[in-house]
A protein has these predicted regions:
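Conserved active-site-proximal phosphate/metal-binding subdomains
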Residues: 1, 6-135
Length: 135
């Protein structure tokens, strides 16, 4: 399995050539028509590119998020040396992700996406996404 920035057949072929037997493509499915995230979140994903992402370190891992009040606060805390535990508490656990991803509230939540969002140019169906990923 390969993951990270895979949004089309070119990326899928590249990791396949390196030995991967499958891909985990997250962000491209989040922006699909059938996804339950609000259209406002899908539009933000389509409009964004990799340079828009906010990167911060917390438990259990690094997060990439679209700009918003909470994600900007988390980046500032991370840069100021806050502990991973402090950052995890400020994120609000899964509540922060739910508010951002499922309600589009980026004041109290965050929209977590991957580095491949720059290759997502439209809101398409899951069938189209699968066809785009076909090796």
């Amino acid at each position: 399995m390969a993951a990270g920035g895979i949004t089309d057949a070119r990326g899928a072929r590249a990791v396949h050539a390196l030995g991967a037997e499958g891909v985990f493509a997250g962000s491209v499915f989040i922006s699909a028509i059938e996804s339950r995230v609000p259209d406002s979140v899908k539009a933000k994903i389509v409009a964004a590119n990799g340079l828009d992402l906010r990167l911060f370190r917390t438990l259990p891992d690094y997060y990439r998020a679209l700009p918003g009040k909470l994600s900007d606060t988390l980046v500032a805390m991370d840069r100021a040396g806050a502990s991973r535990t402090e950052l995890a508490q400020a994120m609000g656990g899964l509540r922060g992700m739910r508010l951002g991803m499922l309600e589009g509230n980026t004041d109290e939540g965050y929209i977590s996406v991957g580095a491949g969002i720059g290759n997502i140019h439209a809101i398409t169906s899951v069938a189209e996404v699968v066809n785009q990923l076909a090796v």
